[in-house]
Amino acid sequence: MGKLFGTDGVRGVANSELTPELAFKLGRAGAYVLSKEAPQPRIVIGKDTRISGDMLEAALIAGITSVGGEALPVGVLPTPGIAYLTRKLKATAGVVISASHNPVADNGIKFFSASGFKLPDAVEEEIERYVLGEKGQSLDNVGGDAEGRHDDGLPAPTGALVGRVRPVADAETLFVEYLKSTVPVDFSGLKVVVDGANGAAYQVAPRILRELGAEVVTICCTPDGTNINDGCGSTHPEKLCEAVVAHGAHVGLAHDGDADRLIAVDEKGRIVDGDRIMVTCALHMKAKGQLPKDTVAVTVMSNMGLHLALKRAGIRILETKVGDRYVLEALLREGASFGGEQSGHILFLQHNTTGDGVLTGLQLLTVLKETGKPLSELAAQMEQLPQLLVNVRVKDKGCMNAPEAQAAVEAGKAKLAGRGRILVRPSGTEPLIRVMGEGPDPEELKQVVEAIADVFRRF
């Protein structure tokens, strides 16, 4: 990773780490790097519901237009919507302003290429070099010269060559209609509770389901700029579990702040995580002959039960590092199209280029309609081994390499040898060390994982 770009773009506390000045520089450098061959780059810009989104959007637009780019703001829309619209509108690039499932104080800036995919590391590194002044001069010096270039070496167009802002008024409808086109059935007779996390899906998700015939109950779909992910959404599905039972719904669908992930709840109020969603969809696609290469890509965080369920069905599994970008790389490399993460980032590459929580919900409901089976029965196709994940906040994620920490991890692995596993990794977006364990005995598993977590808590 670079100094600015992490596993999912640039993130930080808005107006403190991720400042308007930095957003301006990212917009300016990003538009230039991504559009060297375009006479006037066109950049789609979307955001979630965070209060800082407007501030950062204004700065990004200023940066984009300052190099002659055309800014196409689409307003509040899920991250995968930006990826889709970048392709649909034949734009040069797309930018999302969101920190996904992070707290409201955080925000982020992530770029998509013209094809709707996340940027390769090399391209992010080039943008970063311009922003940090490691390529030419620092972008702190923004005065132009007589030859139409700024002191940073980037274009300084004047007059009619300055970029324009052209809002896309029908952006939401374009995305909604596309998502509806991926569904071969209607959802009449289904009652669905949607938890929008007070985020980017708060309008889109309920609208699509209603237009497809479902009866929809919404919770946490009233954003006020400060309540995104606040005790709700895919990282806090407890309210959704209660609501599904209270309303007698067939299923609950929980998104995160930018709606690139989905966690479901069955009719009994039980959580159905990304692993079980993937097993449900993969087995259905395999039965219909619609699973390319009979292959699914998952990360090392996926439960061992997923491996057993898919292998029984003759499905090949590609295992990657944690992060949907690595799942994507594996799928593209192998010519496959389906995979994801236990956290609910799930990719259907035949439909979109990135994890899409709303799309995943539609595909899951399609399985319910086509099989006539309740979600509890479909999810039971995978027997989940006991798994425990503990997140430990640390000052320096480098503590993973400390001898004391490594000794604790090795001791834990030794205790579960042959019966389970331990996986310890740093978060790519937060100052956390994640300690995950799987094993047959929940009590023993808790003791082993907590012993490791206690060591990290000392750092």
UniProtKB/Swiss-Prot annotation:
Modified residues annotated as Phosphoserine in this record: S100
SUPFAM superfamilies in the record: Phosphoglucomutase, C-terminal domain, Phosphoglucomutase, first 3 domains
GO molecular function annotation: magnesium ion binding; phosphoglucosamine mutase activity; phosphomannomutase activity
Presence of keyword Signal: no
Cofactor note text: Binds 1 Mg(2+) ion per subunit.
Post-translational modification: Activated by phosphorylation.
Keywords annotated in UniProt: Isomerase, Magnesium, Metal-binding, Phosphoprotein
Cofactors that this protein relies on: Mg(2+)
Lineage top rank: taxon: Bacteria
Active-site residues, Swiss-Prot/TrEMBL: S100 (phosphoserine intermediate)
Sequence positions that bind Mg(2+): S100, D256, D258, D260
EC number: 5.4.2.10
Entries under Pfam families matching the protein: PGM_PMM_I (PF02878), PGM_PMM_II (PF02879), PGM_PMM_III (PF02880), PGM_PMM_IV (PF00408)
Gene Ontology CC terms, in alphabetical order: cytosol
Catalyses which reaction(s): alpha-D-glucosamine 1-phosphate = D-glucosamine 6-phosphate
TM spans (from-to): none
Disulfide bridge partners, by residue number: none
Record flagged with keyword Transferase: no
Family annotation (HAMAP family): GlmM_B
General function of this protein: Catalyzes the conversion of glucosamine-6-phosphate to glucosamine-1-phosphate.
Protein name as catalogued: Phosphoglucosamine mutase
Organism annotation: Heliobacterium modesticaldum (strain ATCC 51547 / Ice1)
